[in-house]
From Swiss-Prot:
It catalyses: an acyl phosphate + sn-glycerol 3-phosphate = a 1-acyl-sn-glycero-3-phosphate + phosphate. This is Glycerol-3-phosphate acyltransferase. It is a multi-pass membrane protein. It is found in: Cell inner membrane. The keyword DNA damage does not apply. GO terms for molecular function: acyl-phosphate glycerol-3-phosphate acyltransferase activity. It comes from Coxiella burnetii (strain CbuG_Q212). The lineage of its organism: Bacteria, Pseudomonadati, Pseudomonadota, Gammaproteobacteria, Legionellales. Probably interacts with PlsX.
Amino acid sequence: MAFIISIIIAYLLGSLSFAVIVAKLMKLPDPRTTGSGNAGATNMLRVGGRQAAFYVLLGDAAKGLIAVLIARFLNVQGVSLAFVGLVAVLGHLFPVYFKFRGGKGVATMMGVLLGLSFWIALFVIATWVIVVSIFRYSSVAALVSAVAAPIYTIIAGRTDYLFPVLIIAILLIWKHWENFQRLRKGTEDKVKL
């Protein structure tokens, strides 16, 4: 029963689109219809600046972390705990409150990983920061981080988390597919940090 309750909470928390919420609170354009059209922190950086992007990043990561922490509190463990994190990411990608139009899941994945394992999260976040600092493309950083997450999970010895983390990575790569096509064509926007 604790697992089912955790799954429901994770999806409902994941469905909170902080890009849309922050845009409304700060009287900014809807990120789903402005910039890249993505309800995420990188697009909010373009649409509303650093402060708006920071709030979105914090909110999107926090909901993933909180979903996993609630499940931990309810004594959900191992692969079941990682599946709760996956559902939080699915909520972000397909939010019930916002007609199933969500973001791409990078910040939420990082929050989920932080709830699962501090060290895995630390290495994934460090990977994202290093890659975006070098290449200035959020999508490249997302790709490398998504590929790295299952690898770091194996290195950390948390093979019980591996399958859900692998699914999260595949979902993130799929959600960034258009970005990768723009990268190939040379039309992808760089991130201005």
